[in-house]
Amino acid sequence: MSKRTKSILLSLLCFFVLVIGGKFYMDGMKVDNLYRHGYQLFEEQIATYLKEHYSGISKIEFSPIFISGGDGESFVHSRVIPVIYDNYGNKAYLQNGRPLDIGVPRYGTFAGLQLDFAYGGSEFIHLLNDEKEYIQVDQYQHLPPELKLKKDDIMDEVLSIYGKEGLLKGVEKNDQGSPQVEIVYNLEIQRIDERDLDKWK
């Protein structure tokens, strides 16, 4: 085999490696963008409910988007952890076992949020409404008014327990809300082992 032929073959090999690598990179970016779009709407829904239905909250923040298991393209194991601060310097994680071992809901895919790609590669994002029906929202960049929750019985129960246990002070459900609350959204993506969730603070 001549040097010229070897050079051509090597160039072709490098070209194919770059093309394949570029495709994997673009596919990964597409998946990450879907996560960010879906969780942006989901975090807005959670924060809006707390802001409009609870007084005494000074700040609401969210963990990164934690993804665990699968091959990086699975939407099964992903979640965020909302954190609530009262006006007395206390904060409470909406996460089971942190610090109370009670039934705190999971905030993630198939627990209020559905993510996928529709036929043709377009985004597929659904959020739950008050009737516990999944509603398509991928056409929105911000939470539509019709998906502002008016009730969330499980969250209400958890926050009631947090109040009784002294984890949060002065956080009460009412129509006054917390109009001046600081909200810190978080669309950073972290791929982790599920067992490492408790390490985030």
Please identify what each model-predicted range represents.
Residues 1-4:
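Short, Lys/Arg-rich N-terminal segment immediately upstream of the first membrane anchor
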Residues 98-201:
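Extracytoplasmic electrostatic interaction patches
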Residues 20-99:
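N-terminal export/targeting and maturation segments
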Residues 9, 68-70, 191, 195:
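Residues in flexible loops and secondary-structure boundaries
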Residues 6-23:
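Hydrophobic membrane-insertion alpha-helices, especially the h-region
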Residues 7-8, 58-59, 168:
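Generic detector of bulky aromatic hydrophobic side chains
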